[in-house]
């Protein structure tokens, strides 16, 4: 009976991971969220009757709260964990539509945003992995997955001229390196660490954007089409999560997947 911990499970891709993984009653699915009450209400309304879902409250930047969540997880699973999925992330609105040079005109805000991006997307995940390692090591499957972004790929950044969201991209690139470091340490113990980009997904991130901001997003999408004529726009969370699960299910240390950073296709094709 595989066990999963999903961070950022209250909405978007995180909630979709909970939905898809809990569809198999043999799976134990644990979601870490900042608002337990609201998330449990959503589960009751949309995933009624699934007794294999457990929601724990923990802001991933709160070390003690995550530590308590590990204790609660162990009580649910009997002290083991098969999959740890680091989905929670800080996606800044400050840097979402501008280049790093433009953001440099607001140096204080830029610095604060970079610090927050690094704290949530890198430091919090490093603590998350360290705290859950005893349970992962005791598990059977031993897979740790971090949700990343194609924007963290240097070749992709240059090819698609990806100027926007620099803080998000920089922090995710740092997280990818952390994944490599963890895998280098725990490969000998049979633990697979890897980063997977979910692709371009419609999670409502741009729903409050101004026409000027959407014009910048449209320009980025046009670059995608130029380099990949098959690009039809953002995928649904359902399709993206299905692809990501397929990638980690097919990944193995023996196949060289450990410490890697791949797309939802399992390769370097980001769209």
UniProtKB/Swiss-Prot annotation:
Keyword hit for NADP: yes
Keywords: NADP, Oxidoreductase
Active site: 168, 172
Protein name from the UniProt record: Short chain dehydrogenase virK
Entry EC number(s): 1.-.-.-
Biological role: Short chain dehydrogenase; part of the gene cluster that mediates the biosynthesis of virensols and trichoxide, fungal natural products that contain or are derived from a salicylaldehyde core. The pathway begins with the synthesis of the reduced chain in virensol C by the highly reducing polyketide synthase virA via condensation of one acetate and 8 malonate units. VirA has interesting programming rules since the first 2 ketides are fully reduced, the 3 following ketides undergo beta-dehydration, and the last 3 ketides are only reduced to beta-hydroxys to yield the trihydroxy portion.
EC main group: oxidoreductase
Pathway involvement of the protein, from the record: Secondary metabolite biosynthesis
Binding-site residues for NADP(+), renumbered to this chain: 13, 59, 87, 168, 172, 201, 203
Pfam families: adh_short
Endpoints of the signal sequence: none
Family: Belongs to the short-chain dehydrogenases/reductases (SDR) family.
UniProt xrefs under CDD domains: carb_red_sniffer_like_SDR_c
UniProt KW NADP keyword: yes
Database matches in InterPro entries: NAD(P)-bd_dom_sf, SDR_enzymes, SDR_fam
SUPFAM superfamilies referenced in this protein's UniProt entry, alphabetically: NAD(P)-binding Rossmann-fold domains (SSF51735)
Example GO molecular function: oxidoreductase activity, acting on the CH-OH group of donors, NAD or NADP as acceptor
């Amino acid at each position: 009976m595989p066990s999963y911990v999903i961070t950022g499970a209250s909405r978007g891709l995180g909630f979709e991971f909970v939905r898809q993984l809990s569809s198999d009653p043999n799976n134990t699915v644990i979601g870490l969220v900042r608002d337990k009450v609201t998330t449990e209400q959503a589960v009751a309304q949309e995933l009624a009757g699934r007794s294999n879902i457990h929601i724990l409250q923990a802001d991933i930047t709160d070390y003690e709260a995550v530590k308590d969540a590990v204790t609660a997880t162990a009580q649910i699973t009997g002290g083991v964990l098969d999959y740890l999925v680091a989905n929670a992330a800080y996606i800044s609105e400050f840097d979402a539509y501008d280049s790093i040079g433009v953001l440099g005109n607001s140096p204080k805000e830029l610095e604060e945003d970079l610090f927050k991006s690094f704290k949530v997307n890198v430091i919090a995940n490093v603590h998350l992995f360290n705290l859950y390692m005893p349970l992962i090591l005791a598990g059977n499957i031993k897979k740790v997955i971090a949700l990343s972004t194609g924007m963290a790929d240097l070749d992709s950044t240059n090819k698609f001229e990806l100027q926007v969201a620099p803080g998000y991209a920089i922090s995710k690139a740092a997280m990818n390196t952390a994944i490599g470091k963890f895998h280098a340490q725990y490969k000998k113990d049979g633990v697979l660490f890897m980063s997977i980009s979910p692709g371009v997904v419609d999670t409502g991130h741009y729903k409050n954007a101004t026409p000027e901001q959407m014009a910048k997003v449209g320009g980025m999408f046009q670059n995608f089409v130029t380099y990949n004529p098959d690009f039809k726009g953002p995928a649904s969370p359902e399709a993206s999560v299905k692809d990501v699960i397929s990638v980690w299910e097919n990944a193995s240390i023996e196949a060289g997947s450990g410490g890697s950073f791949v797309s939802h296709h399992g390769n370097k094709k980001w769209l």
